[in-house]
Amino acid sequence: MNRLQLLSKGLRLIHKMSEEALAGVPLVHISPEGIFKYVMINVFDGGDASKAVIRGFADCTWHADIFEREEEVFKKLGLRAECPGGGRIEHNPEKKYLKVYGYSQGFGKADHAQTKRILATKYPDYTIEISDEGY
């Protein structure tokens, strides 16, 4: 096998690994309850594949804190991340209720309708409301 064939084989292997890493990224990871900031993150593998995920943590003061935490995780998997926006989530597991609203001052407003669709993959039995009201 010549050097070009080895390089090509190696690149295919790396691409396959990043595709598998992307497939393993959960769509939703949010705090189990409370009101907290969230971000939508577009995660990309080394090729053309990508997916949008939702992250929100009560222990993060700023939207950027959430993004930076998750970006490090994705980098370790060989993935790239971008944040198109954020907002807030109210999570009441007792009532099986999620409310998505507001915006991020740093990243802008996420597409709350898309956020709702993504949240519904993890919380199919919840009532999920979206609103453009509030911060």
From Swiss-Prot:
Q: List the expressing tissues.
A: Somatic and germline cells. Isoform B is expressed in both sexes and in somatic and germ line cells. Isoform A is expressed in males and is germ line specific.
Molecular functions (GO terms): protein histidine phosphatase activity
* Protein name, as recorded: Sex-regulated protein janus-A
The record's Gene Ontology biological-process terms are: cell differentiation; sex differentiation
**What are the coiled-coil residue ranges?**
none
- 4Fe-4S is among the record's keywords: no
**Active site annotation, chain numbering:** 63 (proton acceptor)
